[in-house]
Amino acid sequence: MRCPSCQFNGTRVVDSRPVDDNKEIRRRRECESCGFRFTTFEKIEETPLVVVKKEGSREEFSREKVLRGLIRACEKRPVALDILEQLVLSIEKDLRRIGNSEVRSEDVGELVMDRLAKIDEVAYVRFASVYRQFKDINVFIEEIKDIIQRQTEQKS
């Protein structure tokens, strides 16, 4: 590897350790010519996960976009940001585990709603109202009845 200080094409690894849940390797390197030390990161290049929208257009999966939607749904709710970040990572992990490079936006939305319902029901209803485009109060009432029904079934 080329030294960023003197451009010499020879370095040695001084230290190497896994980071980011063993998804990356952090390496401390030292130039064999000038002794300059610097850090590099090595990680697996993942194929992009493409979301196929309802109208057929395609866009790369965006953790940030999903997180923004979750943050908006959880506004003024007692849900910590790190929980939402972990939720987004687990959703992406599950989508990648399916093995397809393309996923339908409906599948992403349903997965988000399923996970969010287990964290905060109010945030779930907020998210569902935007995602499913609730037209009137009756749709909200039906969704809340479904939540109550699920709670009743879980208790028995």
From Swiss-Prot:
Zn fingers (unnamed): where? 3-34
Q: Name one GO biological process term.
A: negative regulation of DNA-templated transcription
Limits of the ATP-cone domain: 49-139
Cofactor note (record): Binds 1 zinc ion.
InterPro entries, alphabetically? ATP-cone_dom, NrdR-like_N, RNR_NrdR-like
Q: Give UniProt keywords alphabetically.
A: ATP-binding, DNA-binding, Metal-binding, Nucleotide-binding, Repressor, Transcription, Transcription regulation, Zinc, Zinc-finger
Gene Ontology terms for molecular function: ATP binding; DNA binding; zinc ion binding
Q: Which cofactor does this sequence's record say it needs?
A: Zn(2+)
The answer to whether UniProt assigns keyword Metal-binding to this entry is yes
Please give the PROSITE patterns that the UniProt record associates with this protein.
Answer: ATP_CONE
Known NCBIfam families for this protein?
Answer: transcriptional regulator NrdR
Q: Which family does it belong to?
A: Belongs to the NrdR family.
Its biological purpose:
Negatively regulates transcription of bacterial ribonucleotide reductase nrd genes and operons by binding to NrdR-boxes.
Name this protein carries in UniProt: Transcriptional repressor NrdR
The protein's organism comes out as: Lysinibacillus sphaericus (strain C3-41)
